[in-house]
Amino acid sequence: MRSTSTFTRTPAFLLHTLARWLLVWGVLGSSVVAEKKCASNYYVRSLPGQPDGPLLKMHAGHVEVDHKNNGNLFFWHFQNRHIANRQRTVIWLNGGPGCSSMDGALMEIGPYRLKDDHTLIYNEGSWDEFANILFVDQPVGTGFSYVNTNSYIHELDEMASHFVTFLEKWFELFPEYEHDDLYFAGESYAGQYIPYIAKAILDRNKNTTTQAQSRLWNLKGLLIGNGWISPVEQYQAYLTYAYKENLIQSGTDAAKRVERAHSECISELDSGGKDRIHAGACEKVLSAVLEVTRENGKCINMYDIRLRDEFPSCGMNWPPDLKHITPYLRRDDVISALHVNDDKRTGWRECTGAVSSNFNARNSKPSVQLLPEILESGIPITLFSGAKDFICNHIGTEQFIHNMQWSGGAGFELSPGVWAPRHDWTFEGEAAGYYQEARNLTYVLFYNASHMVPFDFGRRSRDMLDRFLGVDITSIGGNPADSRIDGEKGALTSVGNHPNSTTAEQREKEKLKAATWAAYYKSGEVALVVVAIAAAVWGFFIWRSRRQRQGSGYRGIYPNLNGLSSGSFSGFRNKRSSHDDIEAAADFDASELDTLRGTDDRSRGANGHGSVGGDSEDEDEKFGAQKESYHPSNMPSSSSS
């Protein structure tokens, strides 16, 4: 029997040992990856029902914000379609409290709307043309977000703390967006969320150490539509609005009933209720109006007074798209595509009663008290209202703006006794509303719009957004909308129709192509050097093997060299072509574009649905998809935006 020398056995032994260690590290590495996700784990590779054409680049999934109580927030992020002069990210929040931002994603500003339970169509006027859009279900327990039972949060500062934690972790996953201009937008009870989050971000930036200055967040503005912001003025506006819109007639029994409820509301406000977000007696004013407008089993729609709905829903079955969203978001293939964690044990609901009933905000002051400080810090704010919304009506918004004091003046006062004028706004030849602005605050009234302005007027809302962001397509390209303020066009904005390219985008593609060829050229030089070295080494082995053809040299040490090499590189290619690396390549493109984009920071021109229902899951199901409203009690047994 032929013996094998130690010299010939050792390399084989080393190879086997190395293989074992690689196997062990592979197992350990996979377990680490399973615990700590990266951006590719969130990449949405397909979306059931998507329209024909290339899929928009998007990511979705959960981020943990409360380890102790298993609190996770769900997000859905869409990358901007086109390149503007700088990168911008808009974070959208719906209200409630406890109502999902998937309302905003699929009924308002997102790139898609549902034609039926399984078919998506493009949303003309979506907000993702020149800005990245990030939709977040929050607080914990809302929509696709989740938390352990009995661990729901109660106050606005808790909510803001969770959101800052979310952003810290989200930017770790997607660092290419951390230095974007950051905007927050939302509606209804988000009028409480957004100012609290903005203040938390400003406080975070102030407390950031010198060493971490590169991680300051560029908060650039807030947009709040039909927001629940200042309860004192907004509660009292119910009666005024009801008379103005002829929902009730003076002197009638119906009017007297509403006036009695209004008087009780004033008494509660005068008895310490002015610093609270909720006042039970005042919520009865809204309920009274809904009840007295009841006729033949129907009442006015509190979100759009031009419509009527079954009593006691009174608008909670609206908008019509809602009937498609719940079945779509409960489909297994959609849940899988959006990376919804298995820990989310219940199906998606528009509004979650348990979140609403727990989020009482008893110790939180109304967000209107935060606005002056935010405005004075240099953060512009746009408040916009749909004229046909009752629940957060424009009269209440206009009244609290008039009473609010900031930057040395009250309301839209330009100087003592001189008020900023209202500027008429027309869009494509139609009267669209008006603008009014002073000292960093802009107010926009949308004529003939409901509580959900972007649902009614997507392109007009996008025009408002582009003005606020300072997007001017003069140097970008595209077909501008005919949007005029007091007859003047001003900055050109491009809305709707999702153009395939813009002039600026073509320029950036040419730059990227040149950069790509430069990279290929460099990599070619490196490859030549590597090939030369490899050839020299290979030649050395051939020469050596010929000299030692009769011995037990290196050929005996690596008897399966060719097979090992082939197998190794084949496996490497397979891994490189995996989904994760495809996503990595996609992210490379985005980051390259970021470096090629202009950095012009020149300033541009000025630019609740609440859950009304019980705590139980059964009650949520009983009343169907609830809607945002800031009324967690004393309302018809259902809920709303």
UniProtKB/Swiss-Prot annotation:
It is found in: Golgi apparatus, trans-Golgi network membrane. The keyword Ligase does not apply. Residues 594-604 have a biased composition (Basic and acidic residues). Glycans are attached at residues 207, 440, 448, 500. Residues 1-34 form the signal peptide. It catalyses: Preferential release of a C-terminal arginine or lysine residue. Residues 35-522 are lumenal. This is Pheromone-processing carboxypeptidase KEX1. It comes from Coccidioides posadasii (strain RMSCC 757 / Silveira) (Valley fever fungus). The lineage of its organism: Eukaryota, Fungi, Dikarya, Ascomycota, Pezizomycotina.
